[in-house]
C-alpha cells in the first residue's frame, strides 16, 4: 500500500508535541492509531513498524514521548541512548504523560479524516497505551511488552497506580508479552491479567509468546524475532478491527 507521511505539531498545555502522521494515499477517512514508541522515541526502526501498521489501512499518529526534554531527538540503540531515554522518562511525570495524551486524542477527535481511534505502545509506550485506554474515545488498545505496570513505575512517579485504575479501561484491551522478558516476569504478567479481570474487564486478550525477549519486535539487534513480530502484528490488527 502506498503511504504518505508528514510531521504534525500538537499543542499541549506546557509544550509542543512533534508527531509523525503516516496514512494511506487518498482522502480517507481512516481508523487512527495513537502509536507510542519505546524509550528511544521515533527511531527509523520504530517508524518502520508504524509504516507497516499503516499499510493495513490505518492512519498512524506517532508522537515523541519526551517533548519537553528530547524534542526532535531519536536515540541510538546503545548504552548512551538507553541512559538518555531513561533520563527522559525520569524527567516526565504521570500528569505530563496524561496531559500529552489528552492533547493528542483531542487532535485526532478534531480531524475529519479519522473514524475510530485505537492505541498501541511498546515498552514504556505500552504502559502509556494502557493509560490511554482510560479515555472512552479509544476503542481498543494493544500493549506490547508494557513495563512498570506491576509496580506502577512510569517516568518520574514511583507509583502511577495504573493497574489500580484497571476499572477505568473503557474499550477492548490486548496485551502481548514474551516469556524471556526480564522486565515483565511471569508473576508480573499474571498480576496484569488478574487486575484486569478483577476490575470486571470482559474484553481482554492476552498473548504470551514462548521465547520472546523484551523488545522482540524491534527489527534491529539480537532480541528481534521476525516470526513473533509477524504473529503479534497480525493479532493486533485483527484485534483492533474486530467488532
Protein language model annotation of sequence segments:
Residues 1-243:
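N-terminal cap/leader regions of alpha/beta-hydrolase-fold enzymes
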Amino acid at each position: 500500500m502506498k503511504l504518505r507521511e508528514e510531521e504534525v505539531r500538537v499543542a499541549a498545555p506546557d509544550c509542543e508535541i512533534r508527531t509523525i502522521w503516516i496514512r494511506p494515499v487518498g482522502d480517507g477517512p481512516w481508523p487512527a492509531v495513537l502509536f507510542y514508541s519505546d524509550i528511544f522515541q521515533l527511531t527509523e526502526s520504530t517508524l518502520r513498524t508504524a509504516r507497516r501498521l499503516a499499510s493495513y489501512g490505518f492512519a498512524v499518529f506517532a508522537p515523541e514521548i519526551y517533548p519537553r526534554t528530547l524534542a526532535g531527538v531519536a536515540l541510538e540503540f546503545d548504552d548512551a541512548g538507553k541512559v538518555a531515554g531513561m533520563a527522559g522518562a525520569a524527567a516526565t511525570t504521570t500528569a505530563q504523560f496524561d496531559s500529552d495524551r489528552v492533547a493528542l486524542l483531542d487532535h485526532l477527535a478534531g480531524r475529519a479524516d479519522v473514524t475510530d481511534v485505537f492505541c498501541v505502545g511498546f515498552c514504556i509506550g505500552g504502559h502509556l497505551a494502557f493509560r490511554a485506554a482510560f479515555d472512552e474515545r479509544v476503542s481498543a488498545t494493544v500493549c506490547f511488552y508494557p513495563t512498570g505496570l506491576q509496580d506502577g513505575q512510569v517516568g518520574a512517579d514511583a507509583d502511577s497506580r495504573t493497574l489500580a485504575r484497571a476499572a477505568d479501561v473503557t474499550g477492548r484491551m490486548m496485551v502481548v508479552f514474551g516469556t524471556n522478558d526480564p522486565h515483565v516476569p511471569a508473576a508480573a504478567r499474571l498480576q496484569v491479567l488478574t487486575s484486569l479481570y478483577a476490575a470486571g474487564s470482559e474484553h481482554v486478550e492476552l498473548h504470551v509468546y514462548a521465547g520472546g525477549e523484551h523488545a522482540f519486535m524491534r527489527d534491529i539487534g539480537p532480541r528481534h524475532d521476525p516470526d513473533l513480530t509477524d504473529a503479534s502484528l497480525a493479532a493486533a490488527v485483527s484485534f483492533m478491527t474486530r467488532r
